């Protein structure tokens, strides 16, 4: 007979004095040594429910049992004592600390009664855990130098270090590349073999089918179904999640360029740019040269490229320095002289395909103005904007939806209403003579909230930090797509969204195309690119290795180019 790992009975939770009902009379049972997934749309109450299980929130009503024993968690410390661990969607790591210090933080081994940390004991335990579960990370590295996938492994090691038996993962694959996703799914399968109980929040039904045993579906905070994953068809799961059948969204028009390009990218080098050179020189303690770059002193761009090329290709360069160059996103020994060029026209969806880490982030950052390239030209509506600030580019008519929504898209401790206008608040009709117009802002904000179904917003008064990750993303997308701009730059625009929200965003991208907007779509989801793009460019190691119309760029040809 299966043993109960935990059960939750009649759990209810609301926020903002009952305005937002996150969970309504939710009950579920999870058995030991199984993978149980919690499914639902963005804002369905999945993260709230697991946060209650982890002690981050207290339920308004209901009971929690670990095994057969009822518990009352006052904080996450109580949950940890009961062998529950949680890996959050947004990692809780200190970037300036090493991997080792992040793992042991709050649970350090001491030298007897002395206030000194015994790192050797902790390090030995972590290495044993890494060997047992096949999860390896360099313990001496700073977290700031790790990839997203490696940071996730640090979070997993943190919960294993605390001897957790019930492991909760909130949207674990939302920020991972395809290869990292496959590695993560192997880790989950291994956890199950070794006796762990897994709770998985995800929107990706193909991943759920691979690893989950059972599932519970939430809709508007209520349970609408529980079932065996292996025997339930994907279509039925999607129907339970959405409450309706979804139509497939696909670009069926044949694009023909009729006008001058809205955006021309000329001779852009994705790996050698001033920003990264500056960081590199600071790390190498060459402060004088670094300051020259930062202050735009008369220092030839060619010098930077020459310096870096000589340094990175030299056999005398220490491995430590070459490793540092890699961490900064620089390429060495190949493709340092490669540049890319392309153009995007009105009414065109120009998609960038490729495996993560091949220059996509650098490309978007250079177009947005976050980074300045060593030598390039960016022509927007026949004007060279290469040296323009981010603000000037926005005011000129470029909209951005970037990968890191917390860093570049939102002010988390401000309201939803403020965030709908935060990069245009000084413009009409939202202000006049330096005075804000609250009625105009509220009207505009409510239009975006309703059109893009931003749930949990309390008519714009809710703090953005309170929203689910998917609803935060919908807020940014709604804000940027509502602007009357000529160019949309969309990077990983549907990452973290449920299947219904993805279909809705795809419809709006095609609507923007129909309204003659030029769209740059950067995505690691090949299905998304094939469904939406007019033109597909495949990027590999910082250069375009293939480009063509959608009809000529099928899955096989794109796959071959990606793997070159």
From Swiss-Prot:
Q: Please verify whether the record's keywords include Membrane.
A: yes
Domain ABC transporter as annotated: residue spans: 6-245, 315-564
Q: Tell me where in or outside the cell this protein is found.
A: Cell membrane
- Specify the domain of life of the species encoding this protein: Bacteria
Bilayer disposition of the protein: Peripheral membrane protein
- Grouped into one coarse class, the protein's main location is membrane
Kindly list the positions annotated as binding ATP: 40-47
User: What keywords are assigned to this protein?
Assistant: ATP-binding, Cell membrane, Membrane, Nucleotide-binding, Repeat, Sugar transport, Transport
Q: Which spans of this chain does the record mark as coiled coil? A: none
Described function: Part of the ABC transporter complex involved in carbohydrates import. Probably responsible for energy coupling to the transport system.
The record's comment on protein family reads: Belongs to the ABC transporter superfamily.
Cite the InterPro entries for this sequence. AAA+_ATPase (IPR003593), ABC_carbohydrate_import_ATPase (IPR050107), ABC_transporter-like_ATP-bd (IPR003439), ABC_transporter-like_CS (IPR017871), P-loop_NTPase (IPR027417)
Pfam family for this entry, one: ABC_tran
Question: What is a single cellular component term in the Gene Ontology annotation?
Answer: plasma membrane
Q: What is this protein called?
A: Putative carbohydrate transport ATP-binding protein MG119
Q: Please give one Gene Ontology molecular function term for this protein.
A: ATP binding
